[in-house]
Structures are given as C-alpha cells and as structure tokens.
Amino acid sequence: MYYQQELETMLESDLSDLQLTRLRELTQYVYDNIPFYRKSFDKAQIAPEDIKTLADIKKLPFTVKQDLRDAYPFKMFAVPNSQVVRIHASSGTTGNATVVGYTEKDLKSWGDCFARFIVAAGGSKESIVQVAYGYGLFTGGLGAHQGAEALGCTVIPMSSGNTKRQIQFMHDFKSDILCCTPSYALHIGESAADDGYNPPQDFAVSAAILGAEPCSEGMRKEIEEKLGLRVLDIYGLSEVMGPGVACECDRQNGLHVCEDHFIVEIIDPETLLPVPDGQWGEAVFTTITKECSPLIRYRTRDITRIVPGICECGRTFRRIDRIAGRTDDMLIIRGVNVFPSQIEEVITQFEEITAQYQIVLTSKGSLDHVELQVETVPDFPFDEVRKLEALTKEIGKELKGNLQVAVTVKIVEPKTIARSEGKAKRILDLREGR
C-alpha cells in the first residue's frame, strides 16, 4: 500500500530529472533570498547557473549547525515572517538554538512525508495513532501528528510521559499505531506488564514508528516481543524537517528517503568526499522543496550508509541504513572509535540482559575509565554470585571481541537504570573538567 504511489514508485530517470529541476530552482532561490548563501556561493566561486547536473551538487559548499546558530533567529529564513506559520528549534543547551521556520506548504510536505510511512506501517485513515513523542519546539510530536492528520487518522496527542495514562488509552481506545522513541516504547512495554497487561493480547497496536534515537536490531526485537507489534525506524532532524525524512517499510531493510523532497549524500567526515554506496559515512541532506528554511548540503553528523538495490516493497526511493551513531557521540576508548549502538548490538544478544544500559565515563589524572552498566531480566538469579560473575565475564569477552577494546562491565538489578520518557541518556560523562 502507498500514500502517494506515483511519487513513491517513480522511475529512477524521472526522479533524477525532478531532483535536478528542483535543485537548480533551489540554488537560485537561496542565492536570491538568503544572504548567508549568497556570500557562501560567492566565496566558493559558484553561481546558481553552474548547476547543470545532479553531480554538480558537490560544487556547492556545506552548511553546518554553527551556521544556523550564527543566523539566529531569522537570518536563514527565505520568506517574510508573515508567511511563517510555525517555528521549531533544537533542544541544545549551549549557545543559540537552531531555529527552523515552516510555511503552509512546508507543513503540507512534512505531513505527506510522514503519512507515507504510516501507510508503510500498515496504517490507513481508519487508524488510531497514539503520538507519545514530546510536543513543543521538539519536532517529534507535531511531526507525527501532522502526518496522521494528513492521512485522515484519528490522533491521540498524548505527548511523552504519564505512562499509566498512556497505557490506559492504548488499551481503551485500541490504538493501532504508536509513535515514540525506542527507549520509551520499551518502557511502555515493561510498565504495561507490571500493571498486569499482556500487551500482545490486550492491545491492538500493530506497528510502532520509532525515532529520535538509535535502535539496534536487538532492541527492536525486544520491543516487538514485549508489545506484540512491528517496529519501523523513522529518521529526521529538526534542522531538515523532523521525523519523516526517511523511514523503513514493512520489510525493515533500510529507511526510504523521501527523495522528491531531499537529496542525500554520504561523505567521509574526515575528507568530506563522497563514499561508495554501501560504505558507512556521514549523511548530508539538501532540502529541495522547503520554502522557509531551505538547506544546502547540511552536515547531519549522523553515521549511516546507502543500502544498495531496490526494496521488494516497490518503493524506488533510495534507502539509508539505521543510524549507527553520530560523529559527535563517538567515544574514543584507548584510541579505538566506539559508538553506543555497537555496544547495544552486543548486549542485546544476551537473553539474561535487557536493552537498558548506560555508559559511565570517569577519569583519574590523564586516564579515562569506561564502565558499562547493564540490567538483568527480572527472573535472573541475581544472588547467585557464580552465575553473575560468569555473565559479567562473558559480556566483557564479547565486547572486547567486537569492539577491540576492553570495557568494565557492571551488571545491576532490574529497574536500576533510570528510564526516559523521551530520548534515553545513554552516556553519563563524569570526567573531570567535562
């Protein structure tokens, strides 16, 4: 099933023609309406008319988050304030926020993109969509809401938190699509079981569209088992559009990028050169339909890759892999680059361990120390010292084998690690001077 079949199944040649037309229009548009881009193009000695093929996008300069902060509040807007119908901003705690404006057309495009993936998840206008992302300046809640309303669904705008009420509504109203973060979906599953529910039998939810944080395959399976549904990973970021830039279909084999709205590149974050399809690198997006806050070659810092080939679902848009991490949340442990998602992939292989974990960084003098705290499942015999020691040793062995670095493992009892109703805090940095 498709929401916009003609667009979602375009021939590659037709899509390339559409992208080129929109890219050429975009470069002229930002040159004429955003002084930052006029100055940036002039400095790079590139003019809008120099863009003759899609490959010419590599001639255009990158845009980074600091550029948006420096432009606070309105300098990256391409339209007058009278045409801005909504503003979203990043949740950063240092410096100026990164602000993104939306026109009516921008919001319609956003709604259409998200609606495509509700349909891909098996939803329809008959669906009851429970939105448990946060509402506000964060794009998650309103993005999912926008997509559900575009499709004609019934929306329950729960926002995040109030988990008991969340579970009650999910049960009583028979919600069939859940939208939230992976860690919160896991928390809902655990809490529902604690309240005496058997989610696979007691709930009508058939799919969860989860985003805003990485979700390993192991964590996906745990959520699916606890809630009795299918998990689809959705991708977005506030600077580009919020959730709906890309999402999995029911094949769960890569996230389809809405390529009629975005051009995606994967680059080596060190050399800034493109990498071949299938190779991991940093995702870079160009927004080719946005009116208020268009972006040229925006460096996301998100690590992914292009999944080669065409998906069996019939959608022809290229796919990216699930986000492995960010270049700025990468840990360097004794010279080895490690992403939290790599650790998650290892620990979720153990039946005795849940997907809840926290990485604690401490320091003594010039030496950094890394401790991984993981929780056991409720029925693990925590008081049997030999079993506990054996499991600790086995997890440490697997981590070293996969990461090529030793990590101290601390196994804690169930419900020890704080739960999050939004994005999970996976790294606790207690190092001196941090």
What are these regions (language model features)?
Residues 141-142, 182, 220-221, 264, ...:
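Conserved strand-to-helix beginnings and helix N-cap segments that scaffold or border functional pockets
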Residues 138, 216, 241, 291-293, ...:
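Flexible loop/turn segments at secondary-structure boundaries
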